[in-house]
Each structure stands twice: as C-alpha cells, then as structure tokens.
C-alpha cells in the first residue's frame, strides 16, 4: 500500500474511532500556510488537534514515536493559526492517534 493511501486510510479509521467516542469533527486535513493538521475535533469544551500516525508494523518503531519534538512544535504553531481564526477562546489539547495495522491507540494530552 502506498504511503499516502496508508495515511488516508489511517485518518478515516481515526475519524470513525473518534465519532464512536463522541467527538465532533470540525476539520479534516486543515491546511495552513505552515502545514496541515490531520484532524481538528471538539471534545467537550476542548478543541483537539489530532495527529494521526499509521504503520503496518513496528519494524521502524511505534507510530506515535514519530511525533517528535520538532513535529510537536509545528503542530503548536498550526494550532495557534487555527485558534486565531475562531471568534471565541477554547482550551486546546494535542492528541496522537497511533494505528499499527488495525489496532488504534488514542493518546490524549500527548504533549503540551
């Protein structure tokens, strides 16, 4: 399976999972001048910025480990851009959804 195809399928699995948990999906593949946020959702009062990582095996490490410090800093910048567009302030949370084959691990508050 091609990398982009794998990623898109992973995002669909993540969205389906989030909907079953009661999240409201606000944006998918939200593009900014600085990059893209995989999923933006609402969980209670929180705006949740969600990075989805999918791998078919752990051969190159667990998927969640690829959300390193540099990626975290980029996601924070992207979140600021999104939040600045809203007319109301919301608390923000950063989650990671790691998918290995079809197993989903949801890491809430993965970083701040």
Swiss-Prot record:
It comes from the Bacteria. GO terms for molecular function: nucleic acid binding. Pfam families: UPF0102. Coiled coil: none annotated. Belongs to the UPF0102 family. This is UPF0102 protein THEYE_A1950. It comes from Thermodesulfovibrio yellowstonii (strain ATCC 51303 / DSM 11347 / YP87).
């Amino acid at each position: 399976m091609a990398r982009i195809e794998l990623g898109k399928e992973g995002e669909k699995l993540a969205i389906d999972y989030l909907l079953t948990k009661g999240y409201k999906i606000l944006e998918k593949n939200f593009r900014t001048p600085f990059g893209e946020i995989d999923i933006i959702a609402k969980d209670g009062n929180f705006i949740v910025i969600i990075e989805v990582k999918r791998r078919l095996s752990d051969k190159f490490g667990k998927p969640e480990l690829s959300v390193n410090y540099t990626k975290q800093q980029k996601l924070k910048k992207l979140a600021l851009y999104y939040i600045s567009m809203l007319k109301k302030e919301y608390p923000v949370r950063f989650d990671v959804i790691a998918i290995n084959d079809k197993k989903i691990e949801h890491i809430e508050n993965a970083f701040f």
